[in-house]
Structure formats: C-alpha cells, structure tokens
C-alpha cells in the first residue's frame, strides 16, 4: 500500500507555470511593452537584412543563421507579449473596469490578434500597431489605478 501511495507522488507531472493565481496583485503592462519593442526591433532587423550573393556559401550560411535567429526572437517576443496581455486582460481587469473603459475587451482582443500577426508575419505596420495598442492598454491600466505613469519606450 505504501509503495502505491509513494508511486502516485513520484510519477511524471507536467510543470505548470502561471502568473499568478495566488493572487500576487503585481501587474504592469511594461513586460508586454518590452516584448513588443523587441518584436518590432527584430522585424526591422529582418527587413534590413540583405541576402548575400548566392555564390558565397559561407556568407549565405551566415545570412540564414542570422535571419533564423531574428525570426525566432521575433516570434518568441510576440508570443510573450500576448501572454502578458492576456494576463492583464483576464486576471487584472474586472467587470467594474468596463464602466470606465467600455472598449477594454475590443482593445485587448485586437492587441492579442496583433501579437499573432507579428509572430507569423514580417510586417512593420503590424509591429508598430501592436506597440500602439499596448500604449493604449498602458493608459487604461494606470488610469484604473488613478495613477499618471508616463509612456516610454526603451528602444
């Protein structure tokens, strides 16, 4: 009997990550902003990257390596921005906030869709629109706390 009980506690468990159903009460749209800025930066780098002459195998390999790295970072950061926005939307904002921000759901929905677009496309327009959407969410978030926190970007 003891062995069965012990076995039930030592099995393979999937690791769950969360922010934060404790609830910790620590929320800030800055993490979404930083991720969106990184995705925008990678989008610009991808668009600026010049393909080498196809006859130079070493330069072509370096180009593909750099392009792949930029794409991976862009996709990771767009996904991270989406995760952070969804946390704010579903964990921080409450029905009472809809009175003050009637467009809250639409704003977050559009921002989440932009995260997906930035992830799968190389669109300077969508990457910029995502940062603009997060700026709007930043304003709502800090207004909901009756605080005036200036918007800024790190880049």
What are the functions of these language-model segments?
Residues 1-67, 102-136, 140-155:
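N-terminal intrinsically disordered, cationic/polar leader segments
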Residues 65-77:
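Alpha-helical scaffold segments that form or flank carboxylate-/histidine-based iron centers
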């Amino acid at each position: 009997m003891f062995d069965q009980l012990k076995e039930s506690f030592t099995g393979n468990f999937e690791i769950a990550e969360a922010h934060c159903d404790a609830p910790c009460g620590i929320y800030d749209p800055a993490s979404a902003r930083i991720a969106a800025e990184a995705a925008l930066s990678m989008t610009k780098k991808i668009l600026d990257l010049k393909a080498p002459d196809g006859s130079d195998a070493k330069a072509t390999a370096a180009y593909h390596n750099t392009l792949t790295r930029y794409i991976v970072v862009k996709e990771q950061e767009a996904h991270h921005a989406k995760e952070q926005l969804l946390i704010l939307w579903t964990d921080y904002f409450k029905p009472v906030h809809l009175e003050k921000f009637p467009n809250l759901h639409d704003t977050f929905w559009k921002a989440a869709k932009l995260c997906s677009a930035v992830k799968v496309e190389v669109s300077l327009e969508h990457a910029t629109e995502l940062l603009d959407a997060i700026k709007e969410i930043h304003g709502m978030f800090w207004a909901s706390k009756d605080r005036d926190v200036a918007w800024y970007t790190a880049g």
